[in-house]
């Protein structure tokens, strides 16, 4: 089970649809547009892996990782970023 977190819908849906999750033996892929939405999904659905952007408006990816690890210490995290500087 994987959770994709990004405040840009095109990125979220692109990752969800472009990756062959079944080939990777992933049964469920959840998406969240914000850190708060991601924390709710983590508690309700229990994904093992979270892919998150760093630059988000409501809560940064680093803040999300810290909060997520407090409730799910064994969570594996993949961090993405796309800024130029």
Residue spans for each PLM region:
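Conserved active-site segment of CheY-like receiver
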Residues: 7, 79-84
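Acidic, metal-coordinating helix/loop segments flanking the phosphotransfer/catalytic sites
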Residues: 16, 31-49
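Short amphipathic alpha-helix used as the core "switch/output" element in two-component signaling
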Residues: 40, 62-73
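His-Asp phosphorelay/catalytic-motif detector in bacterial-type signaling
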Residues: 46-48, 72-76
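Acidic catalytic/metal-coordinating carboxylates
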Residues: 34-37, 60-63, 81
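Two-component/phosphorelay signaling modules centered on CheY-like receiver
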Residues: 9-30
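Active-site residues of response regulator receiver
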Residues: 6, 53
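Receiver (REC) domain active-site loop signature in two-component systems and cognate sites
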Residues: 56
